[in-house]
A protein has these predicted regions:
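Low-complexity, intrinsically disordered segments enriched in Ser/Thr together with acidic residues
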Residues: 1-15, 114-148
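Short, surface-exposed beta-strand/loop "edge" segments at domain boundaries and coil↔beta transitions
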Residues: 16-21, 91-98, 126-133, 163, ...
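Short, ordered, surface-exposed loop/turn motifs in non-cytosolic proteins
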Residues: 62-64, 193-216
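Hydrophobic beta-strand positions
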Residues: 89, 155, 189, 204-205
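Gram-positive cell-envelope targeting signals
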Residues: 40, 49-53, 62-67, 118-122, ...
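A surface/secretory-pathway sequence property marking extracellular, secreted
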Residues: 70-117, 205-216
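Short, hydrophobic/aromatic beta-strand segments
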Residues: 61-68, 78-81, 199
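Serine/threonine-rich, low-complexity linker/repeat segments that form flexible spacers/stalks
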Residues: 2-62, 68-72, 151-194
Length: 217
């Protein structure tokens, strides 16, 4: 079906046309609007990830707006120098959102970033101030097939309570076996005399990232 216009509809039974007509088609409703919404993707090498934060599709006026972001998956860090801030007008048409009349305004703002967090003070946002913040991140280890990279963005202002948007990038490796995070382990705890040891605690740590997967007794 085209997004808008007339579309042919034909029903056949046993290779015989029973119903043949034209119907009018179009996009139903409007795209959902969020104060911010996060999207992320794997650039193909499973090392470089791309992210975008779409800001103010809701046409809000926010005083002293601050946008923050945190990388929640260990071993993944922002790529220095990759941050871009664009300003324009968010428009929903033909089933997709586009930032029309996009202008690069990166030089007008300061990105305060560490390896895994950043903040941008957007100042006083009017209802007509629409933004897209784009950046890249680096996976500093060999990711496994079906691994999920998690990331969260938040916007807050004097008249705006913290509003979050979460993003998940699914790593899909061609020929992967779908191992993901599935694992099993059995531990028999004994003392120096090979007797069962009570009250001992241990952690399961992922060697690639140092992430603690669990603590057990």
């Amino acid at each position: 079906f085209p997004n808008d216009g007339n579309a042919p509809v034909k029903f056949s039974v046993n290779n015989k046309v029973k119903f043949d007509c034209t119907v009018k088609s179009g996009t139903v409703g409007e795209g959902k609007r969020y104060t911010i919404i996060k999207s992320g993707w794997d650039n193909g090498d499973h090392k470089s990830l791309g992210f975008r934060i779409s800001v103010n599709r809701t046409n809000e006026a926010i005083s002293n707006a601050v946008l923050s972001d945190s990388m929640e998956s260990p071993g993944v860090t922002y790529k220095a120098g990759s941050f871009k801030i664009y300003k324009g007008t968010w428009d929903y048409s033909n089933g997709t959102w586009q930032l029309k009349n996009k202008t690069d305004v990166t030089s007008q703002y300061t990105v305060n970033a560490t390896d895994t967090t950043f903040t941008i003070n957007l100042g006083n946002i009017s209802a007509n101030d629409h933004f897209a913040v784009e950046y890249e991140a680096v996976v500093n280890y060999d990711a496994v097939d079906r691994e999920v990279i998690k990331n969260k963005a938040t916007i807050v202002g004097d008249n705006k309570k913290p509003y979050d948007s979460n993003s998940k990038v699914n790593i899909q490796i061609a020929g992967g076996e779908g191992v993901g995070y599935a694992f099993g382990i059995q531990v028999h705890k004994v003392d120096e005399s090979n007797e069962p040891l009570k009250g001992a605690k241990f952690q399961v740590i992922r060697q690639a990232t140092g992430q603690v997967l669990g603590e057990f007794e």
